[in-house]
Amino acid sequence: MSKDFDIRHSNAGNIFLGVLAIATIRDFIEISLKGRELIDPLNPSNSLKTYFLHFNSFYFLVFVSLSLILYFFARKKTCISECFKIGALAMALIWLGPLFDYFAFGHFDMTYPSDPLFVVCNLHHFVDPNFSYEGLSKGMRLEIILAGLGGMGYIYYKTKKIIRSVCGGICLSATCLAIGLLIPFITQYYEYGLNFGYHKLYNSTLLHQGFVVHGAGCKIALFYIFLCIILFSLAYYIRSHNRFFAIIRNMRWTRSLHYLVLFGAGIMFIYHNPPIPNPSLADYYDYLATIWNHPIDLFGIFMASVAIFLSFQSAVIFNDIYDYGIDEVSNADRPLVTKAISQSEYRLIGRSFAILALTIAFCIHETFFFFVLLYQMMAFLYSAPPFRLRNYFIASNLELAIIFLVTLHAGTTVLIPEYRFENVPHHITFGFIICYALALVVKDFKDYEGDKKSNVHTLYTLFGIKIGNFATAILVCCATLLTPLLLHLSQLIVFSGIVCILFLLAITFVEKRNIKEMTVTSLYFIYVLTIFYFLIFQQQGTYIDYH
């Protein structure tokens, strides 16, 4: 029997769902023993985020950390997959803490240690039942000790080395404690320097500044999710170097950058073009003033960008799955074509990226979650049968243009969730869609052979390479010349004319596919960045009006 995950039976997915189930049961035990309402009727969304995202992301971080430590100390006698299975089973220990505290002492109250430095300086009392730490109950200490003992036993069973086993057990317990102390250390050091003491964690300015992420618990969850992404990536690299690098190479980095540029442009647009004051919304504008007078939450914006990036990567994976026949002819280096990864495992990774992107988006706020979900649904219509709009170049170009617009609007909602789609002038919205829909025909050149074999309708498959190149050049030139007119950027008409000529030369006379793609892509980024610069910085305060 293989030591690795049998992806065909979804063992990897079952393990992660099992850990999620264990963590959710722990949430329910905690809520029940505290005597609180399951969902606060006054703020149901925040309750759900706190229990399902904040706490569960913490437990996932513990799970992946412990699994990697087990592998590190027993790696010569085990595999990363087995360590993840053992780690998942060991997570059942998290039920013990609240139950032990409640039945042994009659109460349970889980919180973060109020003075992390005090805990570190008094670790020699950790196993002393008569010594107390604020925010670190005896049940939680019991969980940490049992995790270390269990890990010690597993490492000894695999290696038969006592010193290695003891070191592994100590490292496991220390890691559990360190994860619990990490956020208190970061927030208190940020706000009070080395003056540690009793401070309210959830009142820390670090967890509230910038107003991108609404709620301290959500920002903590994002921090844990970020660490989980790093550690899960490390685990997948350990599991298979070849598969890991096959996915990295296939991430379409240029197109990823394109989506991040659109997303960043949306953020910059709303930041430099704040809503026009309206006396009837005085309280709301006090809120806006608070945003603009505080430091920008760079971590929140970074994680929002990660959500956009992961959404695109999920779309790439599913597009590769449905484009397998085309890629066999036109893109022989794709992971599925080279057999670097199985389709079932590739599909599982795509689903994981999509779920992770939605989770991050929900941590930020519901409006951003909606735009990320909308992005993923439109990407599904583009790639998946029976709709598969990708087969029809007019429909596919129009949908991709709308997806680009959705990405731009996702950026505008990050700073202001209440931002209304209809308040962007129609000439910008329709100009954006029309210009991209015309220009996107250029993407079909590189897949000509595969599209022709699979009966995909593009300008190239309908009219051939020569006429297709000419028609593509004309449409791209039209898009380039229309852009300053539709967006009311008359100062860029001459610049657009120059770029138009360069596009025409690159598309018509450059024959090698790689050189043509690189040239057109470089011209595109130069042109788009110039357009966004003038749109954002040269016409401030002219577009957005709330009434």
What are the residue ranges of the model-derived segments?
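Multi-pass alpha-helical membrane architecture of UbiA-family
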Residues: 2-547
